[in-house]
């Protein structure tokens, strides 16, 4: 199902994006004086478009570096109209450009996220910023909630002060009783960070944004599961160096690696699970998972990012987008 209309939002574009979009029949909106990046650009576009739409209409918002699956719109529209979902978000898959490097590791990570969404019957915790279909009545409800003081924000659809506008928008919607879903078939392929440096800044922004959103909303029935998830994640991060320390100490004391059948089968089960959850990615994804060590190093890297984000949040350091 094709979109009824395509609008390209150009924010400080210096290339031929606007001309190319218009040549394909898209409507082009240029931002004016935008200082709030993606959230500000989308807010300007929505302020222009929403007044002319009916409550029964829907708006698809997606990143420029994202390609939709052929049936994305049809599946998403059906989910919104039949299930009353606030929004239908993308199940994003990575466009890997290497076999065992940074982009391949992100590919496996995204494959596991897609598997987890399938296991949870499409129940989404966050509507991905890569692509999401939103019913107009829900977007208007968000604006009214912000203007009426029920929600944080400045009276627009997207908060202007959140590092992760998609995360914050999902939280706002859930506080108003809306639901979110990412059903099978609503997949997209998106670009990923090509280097560790750019990945570091991206994930630092994501995690800092998630923590800041929880701080802004406080402890409520809606945020409680998110708080619990964050606490458990950080406990797991703290346990990892303790586990490694115990093993190293045992090797030093005994001169051999500590061995036990329970630990062997537990480790084997973990490896099988990690391989099984990326099987949709083909042979390269399976080989990377079987190697184990690259993904362990990747996990340690992310642990450092999460700890850095928590430290920045506790110190209340400036929140801003970083670019390598």
Label each PLM-derived region with a short phrase:
Residues 2, 10-18, 33-35:
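A conserved acidic beta->alpha catalytic loop
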Residues 1-7, 26-27, 57:
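Short loop->beta transition adjacent to catalytic acidic/histidine clusters or analogous donor-positioning motifs
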Residues 167-188:
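Catalytic donor-sugar/metal-binding loop of nucleotide-sugar-dependent glycosyltransferases
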Residues 15-22, 71:
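Acidic helix N-cap motif at the loop->helix transition within catalytic regions
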